[in-house]
């Protein structure tokens, strides 16, 4: 079981890491350009910027390429079992999907009246993952690596990982709130 958990986490790193990169490189022009939706509330808010989105996707792809190099050097063959073009496309879709899922989560939170940085269980912990998996699953090589068992395990472990890592970041004064 531990092997399956570790493999699942390894496969999901390209969608677990983009939001961290987005925070590091973010800022600048909001994706919604400051516009409001028909309900009068901001579409996404100031926390979702073009630089953060692009930087997050690039960070996820960078993470995946580091994984690929580690696999090649160590003899491990998970992502590196795919031809490079399939690996690259798949991991790009995972990273893009994670960032797009985060935008979807922000949109939903704004509609329900949640402010930037406020806690909204399930949306905060799973939206990025579900959208990433949905988008990536449309690309056939996804199914060479992602079994139903891995997808189910991902949905189960991601909220706990998300909350645990955020709590650690909070305790290290890297985040203002523990969620």
Curated annotation (Swiss-Prot):
Entry-linked Pfam families: CarS-like
Residue stretches spanning the membrane: 53-73, 88-108, 120-140, 145-165
A GO cellular component entry from the record: plasma membrane
Membrane topology reported for the UniProt record: Multi-pass membrane protein
Pathway where it operates: Membrane lipid metabolism; glycerophospholipid metabolism
BP terms from Gene Ontology: glycerophospholipid biosynthetic process
Cofactor(s) for this UniProt protein: Mg(2+)
UniProt entry keywords in alphabetical sequence: Cell membrane, Lipid biosynthesis, Lipid metabolism, Magnesium, Membrane, Phospholipid biosynthesis, Phospholipid metabolism, Transferase, Transmembrane, Transmembrane helix
Protein's name in the database: CDP-archaeol synthase
Protein's organism: Archaeoglobus fulgidus (strain ATCC 49558 / DSM 4304 / JCM 9628 / NBRC 100126 / VC-16)
């Amino acid at each position: 079981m531990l092997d399956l958990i570790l493999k699942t986490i390894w496969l999901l790193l390209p969608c677990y890491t983009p939001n961290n990169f987005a925070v590091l490189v973010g800022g600048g022009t909001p994706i919604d350009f400051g516009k409001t939706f028909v309900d009068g509330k901001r579409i996404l808010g100031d926390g979702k910027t073009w630089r953060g989105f692009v930087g997050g996707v690039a960070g996820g792809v960078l993470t995946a390429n580091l994984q690929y190099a580690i696999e090649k050097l160590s003899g491990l063959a998970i992502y590196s079992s795919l031809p490079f073009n399939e690996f690259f496309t798949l991991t790009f879709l995972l990273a893009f999907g994670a960032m797009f899922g985060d935008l979807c989560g922000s949109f939903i939170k704004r509609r329900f009246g949640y402010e930037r940085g406020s806690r909204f269980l399930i949306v905060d912990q799973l939206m990025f993952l579900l959208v990433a998996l949905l988008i990536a699953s449309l690309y056939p090589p996804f199914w060479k690596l992602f079994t139903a068992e891995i997808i189910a395990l991902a949905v189960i472990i991601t909220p706990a990982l998300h909350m645990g890592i955020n709590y650690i970041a909070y305790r290290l004064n890297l985040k203002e709130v523990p969620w």
